[in-house]
Amino acid sequence: MFSNWDIFLNYKNFTINQEIKNKLDLYYQILIQENQKYNLTRITELNEVFEKHFLDSLLFVEQFQIIDQKIADIGTGAGFPGIVLKIFFPNIKLTLIESNNKKANFLKYLVQKLELNNVEILNKRAEELNEYKEHLI
């Protein structure tokens, strides 16, 4: 389990609580468990995942306030930044767009295990999104 939670404390537009910590820990466990099957990331060391994937997913939040927007994450791969944003901001409506079928299946599994609501996963390429205009911001 991750213990260096202080890295999340230097930011003004989000806070971290025990529920978020639990979900991030579970996300990491699932990511590592499923990584070999789905080829999700080459970064697998605990502290690196939390700093380079989870914390980096929140960097633009310092410039843009997030409350309950609709957010589309195109080419989300292992769910960065979309899933991390959803964990920190559960009121957003999130659409994850991933062309790789195996990674899209991983995302479905991850969303279920993390018990995230209002998440739609589209197994599509960006060029195919014209029919999904309502998802684009």
UniProtKB/Swiss-Prot annotation:
It is found in: Cytoplasm. GO terms for molecular function: rRNA (guanine-N7-)-methyltransferase activity. S-adenosyl-L-methionine binds at G75, F80, A126, E127. One of its GO terms (cellular component) is cytosol. InterPro entries: rRNA_ssu_MeTfrase_G (IPR003682), SAM-dependent_MTases_sf (IPR029063). The keyword Methyltransferase applies. Its EC number is 2.1.1.-. It is an enzyme of class 2 (transferase). The keyword tRNA processing does not apply. Gene3D superfamilies: Vaccinia Virus protein VP39. It comes from the Bacteria. Signal peptide: none annotated. Keywords: Cytoplasm, Methyltransferase, rRNA processing, S-adenosyl-L-methionine, Transferase. Its main location: cytoplasm. It holds the Pfam family GidB. Specifically methylates the N7 position of a guanine in 16S rRNA. Belongs to the methyltransferase superfamily. RNA methyltransferase RsmG family. NCBIfam families: rsmG_gidB. This is Ribosomal RNA small subunit methyltransferase G. It comes from Mycoplasma mycoides subsp. mycoides SC (strain CCUG 32753 / NCTC 10114 / PG1).
